[in-house]
């Protein structure tokens, strides 16, 4: 109602493993926020440009009122950005009364690196299709290895974002992620490390194909 100014959500969660939105979740958020005049903000710091060129909002077809993006827009250099619909962004100075600035805003090196990265992405034919196929090939290999070892796993993927859960049930939220087998993850992590493959040391981290 009138007491809720904004709803902010990761359209693809990235800090409890890679947890995908269930069917209808984002659509319901969009419908209800529009109904009550509440601003819908997508935190695409992790999924922006990783799920596809237009981020998770492009992949799932849900357009928020505002979007937050992280260092991926700097081509790996420290950078961040936010944007939104005209009526919201017009409130930012100098057009509006909300002042936002900093000594690192618009850093030339980070902005140049980010621009070059985005131009490369747009010019490489089938860039995201290739990236997604590479990710799927890796996950298919993990599934085959797990089946051969008799270990129950779930793999999640959205574009180039992915992770593996040691669980025999679907992982739909934080509680499901916490219920996964941490001992099996630790054994898997150490086994991979012994083979010269360094992964994030936490089951709550999302991995990215490059």
Where on the chain are the PLM-derived regions?
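Conserved N-terminal phosphate-binding loop of PLP-dependent enzymes in the Aspartate aminotransferase
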Residues: 1-210
């Amino acid at each position: 109602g009138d007491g809720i100014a904004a709803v902010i959500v990761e359209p693809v969660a990235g800090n409890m493993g890679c947890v995908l939105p269930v069917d209808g979740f984002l659509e319901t958020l969009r419908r209800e926020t529009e109904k009550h005049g509440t601003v819908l903000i997508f935190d695409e710091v992790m999924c922006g440009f990783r799920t596809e060129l237009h981020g998770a909002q492009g992949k799932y077809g849900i357009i928020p009122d505002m979007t937050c993006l992280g260092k991926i827009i700097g081509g790996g250099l420290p950078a961040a950005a936010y944007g939104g619909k005209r009526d919201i962004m017009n409130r930012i100075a100098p057009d509006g009364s909300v002042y936002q600035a900093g000594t690192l805003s618009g850093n030339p090196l980070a902005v140049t690196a980010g621009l070059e990265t985005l131009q490369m992405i747009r010019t490489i034919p089938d860039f995201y299709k290739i990236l997604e196929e590479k990710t799927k090939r890796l996950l298919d290999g993990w599934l085959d290895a797990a089946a051969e070892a008799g270990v129950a796993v779930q793999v999640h993927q959205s574009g180039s974002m992915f992770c593996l859960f040691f669980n025999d049930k679907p992982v739909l939220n934080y509680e499901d992620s916490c219920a996964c087998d941490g001992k099996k993850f630790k054994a898997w992590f150490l086994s991979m490390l012994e083979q010269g493959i360094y992964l994030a040391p936490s089951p709550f981290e999302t991995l990215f194909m490059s």
